[in-house]
């Protein structure tokens, strides 16, 4: 056997050595503003269709073994530049390659031609880019209202009283996806119920939605995917930006942004947001407010520093919010009004972050360090239920990245630390938690540009509450053809359940929480396939995206409100729990300046509640989406129209309640229509729109609203809209810097 292996090695080398017996040498340059050649260090140089390659040195020089056959194609690539392909013969002359920057071309395409929401062609992980143009197709007052034109993310009310909204990704609650702001984990813990409303729409530059497991360098928590928000940058062109909004329900908002160039190396930006709703509205006459009344003040200051050896971003945010709901007469001045049912949530939140990067002499080599601190103080009551929470959160992530042999092989390694302190009080029960999680990770990327990419990562973390655990993850991207891209992912995620904070909507019931046992960490595997096909149709490109994702829980914390009419039982999973999600989406420019998207998603989500495997409650079986966006010539007007068809979802069982409080087993199918018209001027934009134009609302969303302190009161079985049609109008003003 050993002789055969030795013979095979010798025979293989006899064939391989002559193939790379000669060398090709050359230089790679770019042109500066004066059209003079400048060396381009770290450029990728490789033979087309192979993994044989190298990287240019600090002088732009490269040397590479050359195949013996004629007409071999040498590919030169560099991020931010257009690839060049050179046909090599057997002469011994040195090559000179000048790469052209594609920055100008990309800027034009993004501003004028790129769709508002699209799957990035170049990203390893299937990532939907929701651009600023897409965000402007609806009112988009905050992050929770930014997915109206998106098929992947569902946003629903979590109860009929507080106005809180929750997202679902891959058919599962948003707590299983990782919410980030500029790739920093955010809105976990006490912010999980209302955090989506803490990001004003006017602050956002773009949103990235990726499904399945993420990179290990972002942590261990992501199970179903990531939603990352990019704020507007201090170095952008917005000298002054103002957005004013109001609707017929009495909600008004004001936003102001300004970026300032302090010095050649320093830029800063300030953001301000104020919103208010004080009108009492009860359209369904159940004596409960359809929308809460609230006031929010939100401030943000960020800085950007850039030099040849270092780049840094720093910021501080502060939020103060007070929202109230409950019975309409609770807010009257009549005697005894305060004996009625009311809710109040007071929130003070402070965030501070820093992101610093250090560029080393070796090409494509850097050190990055991210730090974040969050203070969150919440004081609430829901009728007779009183809940107070305090959280201190600290996150630190140190990363080193370089390449091995050439830039086709990149290695990233680092260490992270997460600290969470919780002090919670629910009625007469106190809960506190100190959690420390140090961890290390490494990640390897193998990239054959325009053909194949592999990302393999693993991290090891130690939690002082749950011990040691390992998180492996794998991503693949293969260009089957230039028009067909296949992506695959697999990996595991883990998270600590925050039972009360993540389920504040259940405090709008008469039931009491009962935690039956010591709760384990939630853990799950996620697997996914994503296929993108581009088709040239009538001179325009149609994109078709088809995907399948499966989530298998190893352990899940079950919130069971179906096996006791008096209690909400909380316990670890004992059985199966999984989610299968299938989605197809087609996008096409039907006629010039008219973009059309048609999508359909099917959810198969099952969990073991008690000892029975059943459909997870309040998850739509399917969703259909149809959007049309048309801009007139020279973009003087824009018309946007969105239709959502929401399939049935299982309603938690009400069989243990008196017959008059029974609800149907499944919700009906319903349709939502949204539309907006925008008029553009040089510095001004005026918009007029309508939400829920079908005026569809959930019938009788509250069980026993006439006796809110009685044993059957429940405002948490929400599957549809609570508010009817809303007409809104607004104005945007933009004054740009002449030059930054």
Protein language model regions, located:
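N-terminal periplasmic accessory domains that precede
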Residues: 92-98, 143-146, 165-168, 195-200, ...
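C-terminal beta-signal and adjacent terminal beta-strands/loops
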Residues: 494-495, 596, 645-654, 678-740
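Extracytoplasmic beta-strand/coil segments of soluble accessory domains associated
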Residues: 144-185
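Short, acidic, small-residue-rich periplasmic hinge/interaction motif at the N-terminus
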Residues: 32-36, 41-48, 77-81, 91-136, ...
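Gram-negative outer-membrane beta-barrel transporters
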Residues: 447-449, 548-552, 572-654, 732-739
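Short acidic/polar hinge/loop motifs at secondary-structure boundaries
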Residues: 62-65, 184-211, 299, 516
């Amino acid at each position: 056997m050993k002789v055969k292996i030795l013979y095979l090695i010798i025979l293989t080398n006899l064939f391989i050595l002559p193939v790379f017996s000669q060398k090709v040498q050359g230089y790679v340059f770019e042109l500066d503003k004066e059209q003079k050649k400048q060396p381009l260090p770290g450029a990728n140089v490789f033979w087309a269709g192979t993994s044989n390659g190298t990287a240019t040195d600090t002088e732009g020089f490269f040397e590479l073994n050359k195949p013996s056959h004629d007409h071999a194609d040498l590919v030169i690539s560099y991020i931010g530049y257009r690839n060049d392909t050179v046909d090599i013969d057997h002469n011994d002359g040195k090559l000179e390659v000048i790469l052209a920057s594609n920055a100008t071309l990309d800027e034009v395409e993004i501003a004028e031609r790129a769709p508002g929401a699209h799957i990035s062609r170049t990203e390893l992980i299937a990532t939907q880019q929701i651009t600023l143009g897409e965000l402007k197709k609806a009112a988009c007052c905050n992050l929770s209202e930014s997915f109206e034109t998106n098929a992947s993310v569902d946003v629903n009310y979590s109860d009929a009283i507080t106005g809180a909204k929750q997202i679902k990704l891959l058919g599962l609650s948003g707590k299983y996806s990782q919410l980030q702001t500029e790739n920093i984990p955010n809105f976990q813990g006490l912010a999980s119920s209302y955090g989506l409303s803490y990001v004003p729409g006017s602050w956002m530059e773009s949103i990235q939605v990726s499904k399945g497991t993420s990179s290990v360098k972002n942590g261990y928590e992501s199970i179903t995917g990531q939603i990352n928000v990019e704020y507007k940058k201090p170095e952008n062109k917005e000298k002054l930006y103002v957005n004013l909004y109001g609707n017929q329900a009495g909600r008004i908002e004001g936003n102001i942004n300004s970026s300032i160039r302090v010095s050649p190396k320093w830029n800063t930006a300030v953001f301000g947001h104020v919103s208010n709703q004080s009108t009492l509205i009860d359209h369904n006459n159940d004596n409960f407010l359809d929308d809460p009344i609230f006031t929010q003040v939100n401030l943000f200051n960020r800085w950007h520093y850039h030099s040849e050896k270092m780049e840094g971003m720093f910021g501080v945010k502060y939020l103060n919010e007070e929202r109230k709901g409950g019975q309409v007469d609770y807010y009257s001045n009549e005697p005894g009004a305060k004996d009625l049912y009311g809710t109040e949530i007071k929130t003070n939140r402070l965030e501070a972050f820093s992101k610093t990067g250090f560029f080393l002499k070796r090409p494509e080599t850097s050190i990055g360090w991210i730090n974040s601190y969050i203070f969150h103080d919440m004081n609430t009551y829901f009728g007779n239920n009183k809940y107070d929470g305090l959280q201190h959160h600290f996150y630190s992530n140190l990363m080193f990245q370089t390449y091995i042999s050439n830039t086709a092989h990149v290695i990233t390694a680092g260490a992270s630390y997460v600290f969470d302190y919780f002090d919670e009080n629910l009625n007469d029960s106190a809960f506190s938690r100190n959690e420390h999680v140090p961890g290390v990770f490494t990640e390897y990327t193998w990239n054959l540009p325009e053909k194949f990419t592999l990302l393999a990562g693993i991290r090891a973390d130690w939690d002082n509450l749950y011990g040691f655990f390992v998180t492996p993850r794998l991503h693949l991207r293969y260009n089957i053809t230039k028009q067909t891209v296949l992506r695959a992912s697999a990996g595991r995620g883990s998270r600590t359940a925050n039972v009360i904070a993540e389920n504040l909507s259940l405090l709008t019931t008469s039931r009491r929480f009962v935690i039956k046992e010591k709760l384990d960490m939630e853990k799950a595997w996620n697997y996914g396939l994503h296929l993108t096909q581009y088709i040239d149709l009538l001179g325009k490109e149609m994109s078709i995206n088809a995907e399948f994702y499966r989530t298998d829980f190893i352990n899940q914390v079950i919130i069971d409100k179906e096996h006791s009419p008096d209690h909400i039982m909380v316990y670890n999973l004992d059985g199966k729990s999984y989610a299968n999600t299938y989605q197809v989406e087609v996008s096409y420019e039907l006629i010039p300046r008219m973009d059309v998207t048609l999508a359909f998603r099917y959810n198969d989500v099952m969990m073991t509640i008690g000892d029975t495997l059943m459909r997870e409650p309040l998850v739509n079986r399917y969703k259909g989406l149809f959007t049309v966006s048309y801009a007139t010539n020279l973009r003087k007007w824009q018309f946007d129209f969105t239709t959502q068809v929401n399939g049935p979802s299982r309603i938690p069982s009400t069989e243990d309640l008196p017959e008059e409080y029974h609800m149907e087993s499944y919700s009906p199918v319903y349709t939502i229509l949204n539309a907006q018209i925008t008029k553009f001027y040089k510095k001004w934009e005026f918009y007029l729109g309508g939400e829920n134009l079908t005026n569809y609302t959930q019938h009788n969303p509250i069980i026993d609203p006439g006796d809110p302190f009685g044993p059957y009161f429940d405002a948490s079985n929400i599957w549809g809209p609570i508010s009817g049609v809303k007409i809104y109008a607004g104005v945007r003003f933009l004054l740009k810097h002449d030059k930054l």
